[in-house]
Amino acid sequence: MEEKMNEIQLKYGCNPNQKPSRIFMEDGSDLPVTVLNGKPGYINFLDALNGWQLVSELKKATGLPAATSFKHVSPAGAAVGLPLTDTLAKIYWVDDLGELSPLACAYARARGADRMSSFGDFIALSDVCDADTAKLIKREVSDGVIAPGYTVEALEILRAKKKGGYNVIQIDPSYRPAEIERKQVFGVTFEQGRNELNIDEELLSNFVTKNKEVPEEALIDMKIALITLKYTQSNSVCYVKGGQAIGIGAGQQSRIHCTRLAGQKADNWWLRQSPQVLGLQFVDGLGRADRDNAIDVYMGDEYEDVLAEGVWQTRFKVKPAVFTREEKRAWLNQLTDVTLGSDAFFPFSDNIERAHKSGVKYIAQPGGSVRDDAVIECCDKYDMAMVFTGIRLFHH
């Protein structure tokens, strides 16, 4: 490990014209991070430090290795290290890698939930990065990774990525920041207590619906949803299933637009597992990013763009049949037992109606709307179980 320092000079800030730029410790102490490879930038460090908080909290809450895929200071995906089914391994493009370590499974899930958004991500890992995880990272387009450590083999693999320029950051897992945090906006200093809220079973005890039966797996998914939201730009909602986020709606001014955006991402995750998409025959040599783009267009309303004569031949060996609206709805109707978390209350029941279309069965939200009764009534209509946490999770 390289020698620690209390300041790192950066090439520039958010944009190339914002100079000078650095990260440093105001009290003169050593930074909790060490750059092992590459030259991370301003936004890289923002993603890294937010992502590290997310995965370390997921590990604490679930006892499982965790990973997140960050883009522009919000997670595109987050997951814990549960084994992959054959179908998930295929849609995440890791079915050729054999059995993966739990940490590698966590990153495959985090990256795979929304591969379009995760392109060029910054990765955070809760555990020491092993060779399996490094091999998975090496094949993806990514800006960098932060972890509490790296095996010798993993570090060698990562240092060879991007012609030797891949950003690798090591963080001291014992580091704890001060209880008060500050930032400046337009020369004015803002100060607040850190959000040290623990997402635990006690927070998930106030069920307000008729259905109060929630399996252990769904309680874990609720924790994943809320911890993910804690580090997502508000307004935000998060759909979770099977130990991973499957749709995150971030930074929307309207709650229903969050729910729709994240719901569409969850729908796309499920549609990728349909026979129509699994049966696509890509031309030899087509890269993962091009396959992802082709699938995204094929599943969407603009499918004719990828099925046009002279276009489909560049992506597919055989021209795919149109994936009709009726076929998609029939497949989506099979998606069940999804968990939905929200960083603030649902003001109208339209959010519940939209969530139902994406298979939501369990909901965790603060409550506190003047229309809570209408929201609860809508949940009862669909036999959903909803918990009021009483805690808002805004993040800016």
Model-predicted regions and their roles:
Residues A76-M116, I246-F348:
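Glycine- and Gly-Pro-enriched alpha-helical subdomains that act as flexible
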Residues D121, L125-S126, R139-I169, S174-R176, ...:
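C-terminal binding/interaction regions
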Residues S74, C129, K241-Q244, Q252, ...:
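Active-site-proximal loop/turn and secondary-structure-junction residues that shape catalytic pockets
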Residues E57, Y231, N268-R272, K357, ...:
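Conserved helix-loop functional segments at active or binding sites
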Residues A61-S69, V168-I171, S234-K241, L271-F282, ...:
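Flexible, glycine/charged-enriched surface loops at secondary-structure junctions
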